[in-house]
Amino acid sequence: MKPRNRRIALIVAGLSALGIATALVLNAFQSNLVFFFTPSQVSAGEAPLERTFRVGGMVERGSLKRQRGELAVQFVITDTVKAIPVTYSGILPDLFSEGKGVVVQGRLDSAGLFRAEEVLAKHDENYMPPEAQHALDEVQKKPASRKP
């Protein structure tokens, strides 16, 4: 093989390898990409069916239903305009409660029910873990001792 043909073959092989590597990386990004939607966007049909995405909003008051003795839970997420029903099987975060912010990740089925695989409770910037709050409360209850 002539040096020129060998050089062309190496360039073609290198470009092919680069193209394949780029395609694999883009495919990995595409499969791990999780979009965020509001309940209004989900109700309007903007969210994909049978594909993982996130929905954020408030847990509607009075919508939380638990099965006795099971981890299954149903609730409704709203953005004050539209609401979507959610079902989840697992342990809910400690901060999860009605009227509070939540982000759920999962899939929307053809019946319009969001089947959550993960539930994340949102909190405000003033949140403090209960242990830390208790420690601060105890310190504030003790009389301040002054040094001379």
UniProtKB/Swiss-Prot annotation:
One of its GO terms (biological process) is cytochrome complex assembly. The chain crosses the membrane at residues 8-28. InterPro entries: CcmE, CcmE-like_sf, NA-bd_OB-fold. It is a single-pass type II membrane protein. Residues 29-148 are periplasmic. The keyword Chaperone does not apply. One of its GO terms (molecular function) is metal ion binding. It is found in: Cell inner membrane. Heme binds at H123, Y127. Pfam families: CcmE (PF03100). Keywords: Cell inner membrane, Cell membrane, Cytochrome c-type biogenesis, Heme, Iron, Membrane, Metal-binding, Signal-anchor, Transmembrane, Transmembrane helix. Signal peptide: none annotated. Residues 128-148 are annotated as: Disordered. One of its GO terms (cellular component) is plasma membrane. Heme chaperone required for the biogenesis of c-type cytochromes. Transiently binds heme delivered by CcmC and transfers the heme to apo-cytochromes in a process facilitated by CcmF and CcmH. This is Cytochrome c-type biogenesis protein CcmE.
